[in-house]
């Protein structure tokens, strides 16, 4: 099958990659239709994020169930042909793993995942919309920590900041401000800051009120320098986030697909769709933070 595989020398486009083997843990075979390029994928490709060698990259995807480890057409309430995505954080007998980082991912014609990780999607999600489920779920994560806080800022001039801002609006958080420049941050001004650019931790702490909350949205592996005295004296809390509810993310995307106001404007979020063989151009475009989300189309359907 076609796949993008990580090697020490970079990304290798293969046309003869072996099909995934189903096991008792990775028990569902999914035919991938669309997959999105994430900042994590870029970091892995640039060797800034550690990842297992010789794995298929990618973790944002949608597709159809193609088979089960038991050889039947159904298993645990799932059926061959169901349109699905998956939570890329999978739990197996080898521990917690992330698709495209510790185990084979979605930049391929097929992916094997645990049935517990599947998220069922409506048929019209068999498009870039379905591959966008994981980013929306990730953008939901910080919002569960901001209730009751008056002044909330999302900082960043990048795709994830733009998405998080739109998801916050879709969830009814009208009081959230998006800031894209450091010089626009006011000292002791915010109750909460959601960061999407990890290089400016001290600036965020300075802009928070005493007792404020800093939510870490980015997943950088680069070391960050902080002045702990300021954090201690201002009694700042730091909160990490991973994912919100994938079901809620699906509802947000469905609402945007049906033109519901105050949801997501995918025209400002979705960029071009590339064939897997055009991966070099796709990754180059995706590496520019202000550019829209870039997708691969894997299936001819």
Spans of model-derived segments:
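Mid-domain Rossmann-like dinucleotide-binding core that forms the NAD(H)/NADP(H) cofactor-binding site
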Residues: 126-187
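N-terminal Rossmann-like NAD(P) cofactor-binding module of classical short-chain dehydrogenase/reductase
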Residues: 85, 193-194, 215
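Residue-level marker of beta-strand positions
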Residues: 27, 60, 82-83, 110, ...
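Cysteine-cluster motifs in flexible loop/terminal segments that predominantly coordinate metals
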Residues: 38, 75, 85-110, 114-119
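Glycine-rich phosphate-binding loop and adjacent beta-alpha segment
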Residues: 200-258, 298-301
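C-terminal hydrophobic helical "lid"/dimerization subdomain
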Residues: 246-301
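Glycine-rich beta-strand-centered segment in the early N-terminal region that forms part
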Residues: 20-35, 46-90, 122-125
């Amino acid at each position: 099958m076609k796949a993008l595989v990580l090697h020490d020398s970079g990304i290798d486009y293969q046309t003869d990659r072996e099909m995934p083997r189903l096991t008792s843990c990775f028990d569902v075979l999914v035919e991938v239709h669309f997959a999105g390029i994430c900042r994590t994928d870029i970091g892995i490709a640039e060797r800034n994020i550690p990842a297992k060698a010789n794995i298929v990259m990618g973790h944002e995807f949608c597709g159809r169930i193609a088979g089960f480890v038991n050889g039947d057409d159904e298993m645990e309430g799932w059926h061959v042909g169901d349109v699905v995505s998956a939570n890329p954080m999978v739990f197996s007998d080898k521990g917690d793993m992330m698709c495209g980082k510790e185990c084979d991912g979605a930049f391929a014609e097929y992916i094997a995942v645990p049935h517990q990780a599947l998220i069922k999607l409506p048929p019209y999600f068999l498009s870039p919309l379905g591959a966008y489920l994981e980013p929306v779920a990730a953008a939901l994560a910080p919002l569960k920590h901001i209730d009751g806080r008056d002044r909330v800022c999302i900082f960043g001039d990048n795709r994830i900041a733009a998405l998080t801002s739109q998801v916050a609006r879709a969830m009814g958080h009208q009081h959230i401000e998006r800031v894209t420049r450091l010089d626009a941050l006011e000292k002791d001004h915010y109750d909460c800051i959601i960061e999407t650019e990890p290089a400016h931790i001290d600036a965020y702490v300075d802009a928070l009120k005493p007792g404020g909350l800093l939510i870490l949205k980015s997943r950088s592996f680069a070391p960050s320098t902080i002045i702990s005295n300021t954090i201690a004296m201002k009694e700042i809390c730091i909160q990490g986030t991973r994912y919100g509810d994938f079901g809620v993310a699906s509802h947000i995307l469905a609402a945007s697909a049906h033109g519901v106001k105050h949801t997501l404007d995918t025209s400002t979020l979705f960029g071009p769709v590339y064939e897997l063989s055009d991966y070099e151009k796709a990754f180059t475009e995706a590496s520019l933070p202000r550019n829209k989300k870039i997708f691969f189309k894997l299936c001819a359907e």
